[in-house]
Structure formats: C-alpha cells, structure tokens
C-alpha cells in the first residue's frame, strides 16, 4: 500500500525543538549572562589582535621573512 502526503494551505503550529530553535529564550542561549564589561573587553582584545596582525603582515625592506 502506498501512502501519499496531502498538501494543503492550512496553517498549523510550527514544529519547534526547544534546544535547537533559533528563537529560543535569551536565558537558554549560550553566554547570555555576559555583562557589558566582558563585551567591552572582548571588543578591545579583538581590536588589539587585528592591529597586531596588520602590523606583522608588512615586511621590512631588505629583510628576510622567517615565515
């Protein structure tokens, strides 16, 4: 016996898996308890890493690169 899925235009409730849902509550999200100081520190660290990476990418004239 072959069964077919009947397609309709009826709107039903969405199927949501709570642990995987992209619209989960903020309390269940990872790092949701980070405070402003933690975020500012992360932004400052990212800026420092970016600045040091760009300064290392420019080699000096007439010098040998070890990388």
Swiss-Prot record:
What processes does the entry annotate via GO biological process terms? ascospore formation
Q: Which Pfam families match?
A: SPO24
Q: How does it sit in the membrane?
A: Peripheral membrane protein
- Report what the Swiss-Prot or TrEMBL entry states about this protein's PTMs: Phosphorylated during meiosis. During meiosis, exists in both unphosphorylated and phosphorylated forms with the highest degree of phosphorylation occurring in mid-meiosis.
The Gene Ontology CC terms held by the record are: prospore membrane
Null mutant: what phenotype?
A: Defective sporulation accompanied by the appearance of pseudohyphal-like projections.
Outline the inducing conditions: By PDR1 through its PDRE-like promoter element.
Subcellular location, in the record's words?
Prospore membrane
Principal subcellular localisation of the protein: membrane
Task: Give residues where Phosphoserine occurs.
Answer: 24, 32
- Which keywords does this chain's UniProt record carry? Membrane, Phosphoprotein, Sporulation
- Residues folding into a coiled coil are none
Explain the purpose of this protein: Required for efficient sporulation.
Protein name per its UniProtKB record: Sporulation protein 24
The gene coding this protein: SPO24
């Amino acid at each position: 016996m072959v069964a077919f899925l009947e397609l309709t235009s009826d709107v039903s409730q969405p199927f949501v898996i709570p642990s995987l849902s992209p619209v989960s509550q903020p309390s269940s999200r990872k790092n949701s308890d980070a405070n402003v100081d933690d975020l500012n520190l992360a932004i400052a660290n990212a800026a420092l890493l970016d600045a040091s990476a760009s300064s290392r990418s420019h080699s000096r004239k007439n010098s040998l690169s070890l990388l």
